[in-house]
Amino acid sequence: MAVIIGPASGRLGIENGHWQWNFWAAAIAQFLSFLGLLFLYFPPAHPYGIPIHQMIKEIDYVGGVLFIVGAVPLLMGIVYTTIYPSNNAHVVAPLVIGFFFLTCFACWERFAKLKHPLCPTYVFTSSSGRDFTAPAIALAVVNMFYYSSSILWPTMINTFYTDGGTDWRYGVALSLPQGFAILTGAGALGIFGRRIRNWQWQLTGSVFFMVLFGSLLAMATQHNKGLMTAFVFLSQTGYGWAIYLAIAVSQMGVEHKDLGISGGISGVFRFAAGSIAAAVYTTILTNTTNNWIAKLVPSAAVAAGLPESQVAALMKVVGTAAVAKEFGAKVAAAVANAVAEATVHGIRIVAYTSLAFGVVGIIASACCKDVDAKMNNKIEVYLENTEMASRNKNH
């Protein structure tokens, strides 16, 4: 529901000056969840049956430190690609440092003789990677597709359909199909998934559906709003089906005692892929659009009557209200149309890029093992404050 309410409440908050409540509402909800967990949640003991004091001693602290000092600068470097050129030290240095420490982390996990490694090798190699690695890759790619639509669709709304964002109420209305599509896909999985079964092929089919219609956003123009709305809805419906199924399949690729490990690793895959996708898509969209603006705007402005001697001055204020104020309405209209056409090129390249990632996701989904045998009503463990707690092996 947050993906439906969030865009609308966020924009409304900006317009009426109460945007902070979008964050306060989330903080209040999280605090209530914390209280519920604190007073009502009594989880079963760790499946390894290890006492807490022993667990604290045997945690892989070195691996944790290596991962943190590797992942943080790596993600910083990726995010910085949206701000600085790719050869800038702000980008290169964090990437090099991050890759170095993540390589050290991988070697530590592989070769150090640890009682409880954070990333046991057998989790990745089980069934030649079909149990966990393939589902985790599929999960990562599915999450990347959410970001492609979440970048492209608002860009279309703002640039093509709402006069640069001035008609914000209509923009809010156009943002709703994406959220409702995710709800539709997730609901359809819950209703029809257990009837269809064949979970591996459900995942493959939903990822293919998501990738197909998400990639078709490359057909975007200033004048095909209805078609693009349909493609966004269909793609995000596939996403809603695929994302929750991918989470479940990746969790089920390990033994019960390793659920915490699979959950943690698949979560890293998912959110790291999301950060990478957001940075890659934003960089491509920005750079491609700017390159085409430099190609299209001067000729469009000159054709609208702007003297060539003023082109340089115009290019400095493209995208601001100063265009109409300093160069007239006719030139401003020509520039706006040229910027929109440049944005079309940027959207197209991002959609093509997402297709490349999507193909990897489809292949990974097809390589997953079917988890039908685990999709049953058997309960492995019980909460310690329930009448069935005595059935737990560890307490």
Locate each region found by the language model.
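Small-residue-rich alpha-helical segments with characteristic i,i+4
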Residues: I5-I14, M228-S309, I349-T353
